[in-house]
């Protein structure tokens, strides 16, 4: 492949996010063209307090599950850090990448800052990010495959493009699962070299752990929206999870940060026309606030406190060093004089 072709592919991928965002924004406007902002605001306020509380609990459990991605990845590279450290790095990394998109760059930067400080090598951090990415895709792929058989296909009959997209997504996810598990079964003891890094192929046991963790994370994230949505529309949880997995996966593949606009459009298109779209969009906005905005504020504040504490601790160490070093130097000098 020539250099020009590689550059062209990179440009297409980088601009695809803008294209899908504009497309999703247009479809979103079309779905909501008959509603006002006050209708959507009333929909958010109409969500019962108990539902919002349960959504917040599901969100907290979801981010705890996300932090286990880092725990699993650390075990893969043989790294050892305290439990609170990988929890902080995992939750903060995902709080940033969920909002900013491009998880390897946005979430990877904060992980690199933290893990290098905790004596994890840069190459191992890259491996951790790769394993975490596979963990997410395994879980999401498993849910998409299961949901394909559980979600009524009549849901997407009104849109030929959506129907084709769902079938393509199902095939992609199924192939991903089959190839990954086949690789872990038959090539477990082998490794793959990419650049200067050597990746040991995970065991089948680890592949199962990755898939289960990815499914758990997706279900908990889905529960956040489900609790916001149920006051307005009655939908079986299994069918809902299918729609959620499809919408979430579509948002990820679109390259739009946080899948914003794309995720909402899939839901609005999939749900029946008899449902009040303003209520659905209000529930989706509440989900965005609970699962994206609040964790970013909370984890960002916690990281700020940690950085301040670390800085004050380093300042304390420097002050102690300034006091102790001159005393030690004078003691060494006096010992030298005595020996002379």
Report the location of each language-model feature:
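Predominantly cytoplasmic-facing regulatory/coupling regions of multi-pass membrane proteins
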Residues: 1-91, 150-252, 277, 282, ...
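Membrane-interface alpha-helices at helix entry/exit sites of multi-pass transporters
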Residues: 84-88, 103-106, 117-134, 275-286
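Transmembrane alpha-helix interface/packing and boundary motifs in multi-pass membrane proteins
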Residues: 92-101, 243-264
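Membrane-embedded alpha-helical segments of transport systems
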Residues: 96-100, 124-144, 250, 285-297
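Transmembrane helix boundary and interhelical loop/hinge segments in multi-pass membrane proteins
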Residues: 103-112, 262, 266
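Interfacial segments of multi-pass membrane proteins
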Residues: 114-124, 243, 247, 264-280
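Hydrophobic alpha-helical segments and helix pairs
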Residues: 117, 123-160, 164
